[in-house]
């Protein structure tokens, strides 16, 4: 058995600096091209121990570590993290929860904590944006303690106040926490590492804590059979010039080799194919943005690997990848089917149609819609086709005649169908925005319906008999009245109050 690289997931609320922190660590700028500054697709960055050591300086001595480095997964929010973890391949071994030191806990921070608790994933908190503390004097790339000591007393006390607020919020959520250098037992307490994704202050400490925790508590779990059949999770399916459809995957066990037969989760049945070529980025390159791949004979855990093979067009992001070795093809197909069965979205007899670009985002959408109490009629991976419009039109309630498309295109032949149909399309590449837009539409539609109903309601009239306007006493009485409220109509009974009696 050999020790593999621990897989690190980075979680946190929107705009708290997840991507910027990874950018600082890997020195690239992925976040510039991301929708709404939210990382919506999964990538992986392998950071070798030698690089960590040079970044962390005296804090990390390579000879103290057996683990080869850290593999960072760039999760699009915590939904994908939980999805990838739930698929049998405990994809993240350890997590970093990024919290803006000024904003403290936000709804998605609490949600991420729930997931970490539920999956039992060890984590550290990166208290980000310390450089925005009023009066802060930045020291590029420095460990936290020397840079903290170099600050004015005022800046120190303001930062302390924010840090202890985060520690208090962790406590409110049932986690005992403290600044990482004060933590005696990391199995009982969460370490909080103050960092700046902009100046790099505290980043050496964060890498040190991640390496230390992995080495100390996860060394046994990192032991893998290097020659065993590869196991991984699809991150993305992409067309590459010269190769056709390729699959980007994170391998977390065993090895995948050129010429291997693999089973990959697909839109219909699992896909059985043969690996024609394996491509890997150079170290310190990010699998989503790096164009310069090198061809390799094999890809061992843990690493992001791009596989070129026939028939991968229908492979689904988030699905399992399994190498067929030491077992029959049929056994591996059954294993992949069983994993995919765990993540089927529950649908109702009436509801909206949901389309998303990956299994992870489809499940994330389904979870978010369930929380918002929006029923789903059908949920599928892929672009919006005429069939989706036809299905949406069959919804019973008007508000459900809608398609919610996440990160997908409207096919040209579906555009005409949509214009002719009474179906509303919502499309966005940020999940929470998509659901917010749909909820606004439902509220506006309900308000319009209520107004229509109210307009049709005839309110009872309240009238006052005008003095000196009684023209006839009875059979029939003829009087002049002032209408005080409501609508006075023909052939309606009238009465009057005497005290409380009608």
Where does each model-flagged region fall?
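Active-site phosphate-binding and catalytic loops of NTP-dependent enzymes
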Residues: 1, 29-36, 49-60, 81-83, ...
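Conserved catalytic network of the ASCE P-loop NTPase/AAA+ motor domain
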Residues: 2-3, 38-39, 61-66, 86-91, ...
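Conserved G1/Walker A P-loop phosphate-binding module
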Residues: 2-75, 94, 118, 134, ...
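Residue-level signature of catalytic and energy-coupling elements of molecular machines
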Residues: 14-15, 21, 38, 74, ...
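Conserved Switch II/interswitch segment of TRAFAC-class P-loop GTPases
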Residues: 47, 79-80, 90-110, 117-136, ...
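Switch II of P-loop NTPase G domains
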Residues: 54-115, 286-292, 328-344
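C-terminal effector/interaction modules appended to NTPase cores
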Residues: 66, 127, 143, 237-502
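Canonical P-loop GTPase G-domain recognition
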Residues: 131-224, 375-382, 388, 393, ...
């Amino acid at each position: 058995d050999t020790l593999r690289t621990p897989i690190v997931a980075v979680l946190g609320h929107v705009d708290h600096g997840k991507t910027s922190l990874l950018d600082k660590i890997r020195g690239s700028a992925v976040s510039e091209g991301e929708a709404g500054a939210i990382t919506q697709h999964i990538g992986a960055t392998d950071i070798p121990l030698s690089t960590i050591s040079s970044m962390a300086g005296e804090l990390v001595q390579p000879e103290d570590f057996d683990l080869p480095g850290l593999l960072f997964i760039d999760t699009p929010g915590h939904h994908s993290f939980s999805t990838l973890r739930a698929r049998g391949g405990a994809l993240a071994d350890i997590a970093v929860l990024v919290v803006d030191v000024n904003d403290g806990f936000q709804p998605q921070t609490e949600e991420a904590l729930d997931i970490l608790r539920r999956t039992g994933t060890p984590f550290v908190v990166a208290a980000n944006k310390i450089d925005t503390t009023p009066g802060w004097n930045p020291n590029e790339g420095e460990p936290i303690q020397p840079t903290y000591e170099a600050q004015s007393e005022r800046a120190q006390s303001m930062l302390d106040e924010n840090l202890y607020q985060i520690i208090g919020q962790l406590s409110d959520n049932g986690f005992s926490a403290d600044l990482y250098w004060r933590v005696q037992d990391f199995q009982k307490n969460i370490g909080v590492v103050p960092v700046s994704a902009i100046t790099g202050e505290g980043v050496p400490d964060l890498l040190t804590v991640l390496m230390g925790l992995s080495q100390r508590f996860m060394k046994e779990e990192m032991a893998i059979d290097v020659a065993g059949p590869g196991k991984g999770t699809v991150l993305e399916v992409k067309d590459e010039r010269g190769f056709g459809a390729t699959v980007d995957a994170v391998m977390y066990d065993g090895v995948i080799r050129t010429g291997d037969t693999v089973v990959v989760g697909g839109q219909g049945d699992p896909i059985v194919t043969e690996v024609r070529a394996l491509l890997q980025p150079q170290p310190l390159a990010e699998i989503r943005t790096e164009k310069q791949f090198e061809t390799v004979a094999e890809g061992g855990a843990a690493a992001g690997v791009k596989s070129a093979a026939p028939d991968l067009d229908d492979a689904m992001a988030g699905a399992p990848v399994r190498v067929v070795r030491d077992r029959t093809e049929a056994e591996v197909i059954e294993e992949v089917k069983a994993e995919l069965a765990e993540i089927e979205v529950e649908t109702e007899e009436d509801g909206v149609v949901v389309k998303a670009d990956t299994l992870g985002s489809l499940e994330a959408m389904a979870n978010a819609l369930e929380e918002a109490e929006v029923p789903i009629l059908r949920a599928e991976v892929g672009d919006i086709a005429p069939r989706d419009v036809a299905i949406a039109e069959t919804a019973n309630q008007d508000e459900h005649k809608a398609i919610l498309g996440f990160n997908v295109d409207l096919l040209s032949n579906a555009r005409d169908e949509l214009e002719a149909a009474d179906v509303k399309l919502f499309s966005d590449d940020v999940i929470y925005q998509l659901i917010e837009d749909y909820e606004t539409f439902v509220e506006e539609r309900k308000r319009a319906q209520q107004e229509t109903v109210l307009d049709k309601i005839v309110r009872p009239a309240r009238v006052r008999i005008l003095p000196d306007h009684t023209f006839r006493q009875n059979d029939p009485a003829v009087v002049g009245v002032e209408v005080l409220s409501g609508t006075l109509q023909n052939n309606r009974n009238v009465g009057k109050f005497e005290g409380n009696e009608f």
